């Protein structure tokens, strides 16, 4: 039987046993204190599932197939998004369920030792609410609801951008769902100047100053970002994960 509880010390302690693997779930709980936490048969050692039906994001931290199956059956009809799921768990969840979409990613976590020095050639500032529409227009995963998430991220989370001749040239945000870095984008006409590296390093330093974890999930086919991550300093590969969507009929 599944019980739904709220964040507590026992849940955080369990997730911290494998902090890197569970960092997105830990960060989600840090940024969303009212999130639902699902436990199975009253035993935290069966793992946990963290998420929100309202936001339609779920983080799976269990290999227990019975738990995963019962959780799936408990969900209402509709499209469900699973975020940053470790590959071994994603394989279980999708074994008998065909994803509508599936994006394999690599997770990088900062080792706390070193961040590259920021490029001083550019004036870096925060994004404003007025930038939301433009950021959304260039968002790789643009959807009907993405503008609302981007606007909320800009308003509530840290960000960094560079403007050239008054035009937005490059930007990087922090995801409001789990505190991970992204989206990061540089317009085509401004590429090759080191702008993306400059805003990413600036944003990492903002997070470090607040003692917030620095982590990012990069799609396997995003060669540019996989190359950039090596230049930022201290970003170590952690594990393979996946974002995917399932339709509950």
Which role fits each region the language model picked out?
Residues 87-99, 220-238:
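Conserved active-site alpha-helix within GNAT-family acetyltransferase domains
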Residues 12-75, 164, 169-183, 187-188:
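Conserved donor-binding loop and adjoining core beta-sheet/short helix segment
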Residues 187, 191, 219:
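Residue-level recognition of the GNAT/N-acetyltransferase active site
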Residues 76-86, 207-219:
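Conserved GNAT acetyl-CoA-binding A-motif
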